[in-house]
Amino acid sequence: MGVTKKPDLNDPVLRAKLAKGMGHNYYGEPAWPNDLLYIFPVVILGTIACNVGLAVLEPSMIGEPADPFATPLEILPEWYFFPVFQILRTVPNKLLGVFLMVSVPAGLLTVPFLENVNKFQNPFRRPVATTVFLIGTAVALWLGIGATLPIDKSLTLGLF
């Protein structure tokens, strides 16, 4: 690798070029109109064309047709609602279950105020936020896995 020579800012030729705008931000091409008028619409229309083309060439059904007269024994929500479903399923009082669901985001909103003194971004130097994250992740996984099991094994996951 060669040694680069630093520019001499006292050089009158360089100063004249910099005054005309021929300095470090002169090279390249401008975003307007090249990118915004020509490249972005091509990418967006190309993406739409690919989606429409795949939908026309391979029209696949989403799931099986619904039969309103044959319902399953237990209806499960989508996977991302499993922890919430498990809370509502295991708590006997439904109002308490709704209160527990509302308390989760409310508790998460208090974490920045608990650690507002700590200015570090490293999670190992923010023990409260790291502990809340790890415990919350473990509880969410526990509740999510338990929601797929029968109600008698849901809290213990069939382990105990």
Curated annotation (Swiss-Prot):
The keyword Nuclease does not apply. One of its GO terms (molecular function) is oxidoreductase activity. It comes from the Eukaryota. It is found in: Plastid, Chloroplast thylakoid membrane. The keyword Transport applies. Keywords: Chloroplast, Electron transport, Membrane, Photosynthesis, Plastid, Thylakoid, Transmembrane, Transmembrane helix, Transport. InterPro entries: Cyt_b/b6_C (IPR005798), Cyt_b/b6_C_sf (IPR036150), Cyt_b6/f_cplx_suIV (IPR005870), Cytochrome_b_C_euk/bac (IPR048260). The chain crosses the membrane at residues 36-56, 95-115, 131-151. It is a multi-pass membrane protein. SUPFAM superfamilies: a domain/subunit of cytochrome bc1 complex (Ubiquinol-cytochrome c reductase). GO terms for biological process: photosynthetic electron transport chain. GO terms for cellular component: chloroplast thylakoid membrane. The 4 large subunits of the cytochrome b6-f complex are cytochrome b6, subunit IV (17 kDa polypeptide, petD), cytochrome f and the Rieske protein, while the 4 small subunits are petG, petL, petM and petN. The complex functions as a dimer. Component of the cytochrome b6-f complex, which mediates electron transfer between photosystem II (PSII) and photosystem I (PSI), cyclic electron flow around PSI, and state transitions. NCBIfam families: cytb6_f_IV. Belongs to the cytochrome b family. PetD subfamily. This is Cytochrome b6-f complex subunit 4. It comes from Gossypium barbadense (Sea Island cotton). The lineage of its organism: Eukaryota, Viridiplantae, Streptophyta, Embryophyta, Tracheophyta.
